[in-house]
Amino acid sequence: MLDPLLRRWIDPSLDRAGAWLARRDMSANAFSVAGLAVGLTVIPLLAWGRYDMALLVILLNRLIDGLDGAIARHKGTTPFGGYLDIMCDMAFYAAVPIGFALAQPGNALWAALLLASFVCTASSFLGRAVLA
């Protein structure tokens, strides 16, 4: 519901940054992998109770994820790039409940249920891509 409103505000800036990065021959795939690398640091941060730093990492991951798409739109998308992007995103999404489960083991069941919903979402998304 908020996504269209936020995208209207965020997308122009991401598009300008993506164009600038694309002109400097930056790789959208490299940004996808870098976003995952940054994002995975959320696991120990959450486990150690560093929620302030974890929030910054999550926001940085989302920024990098927005930039990889903007770069791809300027340089041209590829099937592999789309696959890599969604795989890196799903791996990052899984990292967040894992970190919370490590921080509060009593929440492990809820984290597992959330992870199961991510698996179903990813399977549905990738299964639909096979049919397309």
Q: Where in this protein do the model-derived segments appear?
A:
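Topogenic membrane-insertion module of multi-pass membrane proteins
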Residues: 1-53
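Helix-loop junctions at the membrane-solvent interface of multi-pass transporters
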Residues: 25, 45-49, 75, 102, ...
